[in-house]
């Protein structure tokens, strides 16, 4: 008896789905999930997996540092230009004072950006920062930051640090830790459905306790 091509393809899809589910349950998802990773220098290091809130803060800090570097470069160029013009001491003193004021303004802007009180204000600050550091041309980075801002559960460094400490104590795989920090699961059953590898690793009661603590730490804009 001949088996139709469509039937064969359907069976293959089912087998593939079963295989994918089994791999997800054991985190057999490729080399990038191995606990030991090789960095660009050829050195072995521990796997790092970030939840959405951590990723958001890392990128924000990188953008802030880029703006500071840009401002320092501008200041250095300005001083070099003044030196070539043989500015007198009085003028130089005034310029140095202006530089200090500019530095204070930059630090104030950075502080406001890192501690934005509302999602809307943070998105506005992101637009300004990207304009200053990338010319506003990096749409992918802008979309990434918008996504992270909209879906991050924990807003500030202190809260993210508390989340890291809480989840680190579980002894779970870094990927599982990152997923628990990103997904707003209400029950242990939901968490184990979305993160199949948690089954047989942690009891429902313990997982419920962790989910409750994560919910208490969650920041509402």
UniProtKB/Swiss-Prot annotation:
Renumbered residue ranges of the record's region Disordered: 1-23, 71-120
Cellular location(s): Nucleus; Cytoplasm; Cytoplasm, P-body
Positions of modified residues (Phosphothreonine): 91-92
Main location, first listed in the record: nucleus
Molecular function GO terms recorded: nucleotide binding; translation initiation factor binding
Gene3D superfamilies linked to this entry: 1.20.1250.40
Acidic residues bias: start-end ranges: 92-112
Keywords: Acetylation, Cytoplasm, DNA-directed RNA polymerase, mRNA processing, Nucleus, Phosphoprotein, Transcription
Classification via Pfam families: RNA_pol_Rpb4 (PF03874)
Positions where N-acetylmethionine occurs in the chain: 1
Subunit structure: Component of the RNA polymerase II (Pol II) complex consisting of 12 subunits. RPB4 and RPB7 form a dissociable subcomplex associated with the 10-subunit Pol II core complex. In exponentially proliferating cells, only approximately 20 % of the Pol II complexes contain the RPB4-RPB7 subcomplex. In starving cells, that enter stationary phase, RPB4-RPB7 is associated with Pol II in a stoechiometric manner. The RPB4-RPB7 subcomplex probably associates with TFG1. Interacts with LSM2 and PAT1.
Family: Belongs to the eukaryotic RPB4 RNA polymerase subunit family.
Role played: DNA-dependent RNA polymerase catalyzes the transcription of DNA into RNA using the four ribonucleoside triphosphates as substrates. Component of RNA polymerase II which synthesizes mRNA precursors and many functional non-coding RNAs. Pol II is the central component of the basal RNA polymerase II transcription machinery. It is composed of mobile elements that move relative to each other. RPB4 is part of a subcomplex with RPB7 that binds to a pocket formed by RPB1, RPB2 and RPB6 at the base of the clamp element.
Protein's recorded name: DNA-directed RNA polymerase II subunit RPB4
Species per Swiss-Prot/TrEMBL record: Saccharomyces cerevisiae (strain ATCC 204508 / S288c)
